């Protein structure tokens, strides 16, 4: 059991050393902005459609009950 724990500690230490030399990941800011604009336009379209539906329901003639 102790050999297994020592092996895991060794593997973790080696992975930390090897990862420290890797270049930091770059965040694609332009892609995030593009997606944000698309989502914003979609939400705006949903809001406009909802408003148009509310206006239509307000103006359409109501059915009379007998």
From Swiss-Prot:
Q: What is its main location?
A: secreted
Q: Where is the signal peptide?
A: 1-24
Its tissue distribution reads: Expressed in fat body and to a lesser extent in hemocyte and Malpighian tubules.
Output the Gene Ontology cellular-component terms. extracellular region
| Induction remark | By bacterial infection.
Q: Which family does it belong to?
A: Belongs to the moricin family.
Species source reads Bombyx mori (Silk moth)
Q: Which Pfam families match?
A: Moricin
Q: Which UniProt keywords apply?
A: Antibiotic, Antimicrobial, Immunity, Innate immunity, Secreted, Signal
Subcellular location(s) per record: Secreted
Protein name (database record): Moricin-2
Instruction: Name the job this protein performs.
Output: Has antibacterial activity against Gram-positive and Gram-negative bacteria. Probably acts by disturbing membrane functions with its amphipathic structure.
Q: Which InterPro entries match?
A: Moricin_fam, Moricin_sf
Q: Which GO terms describe its biological process?
A: defense response to bacterium; innate immune response
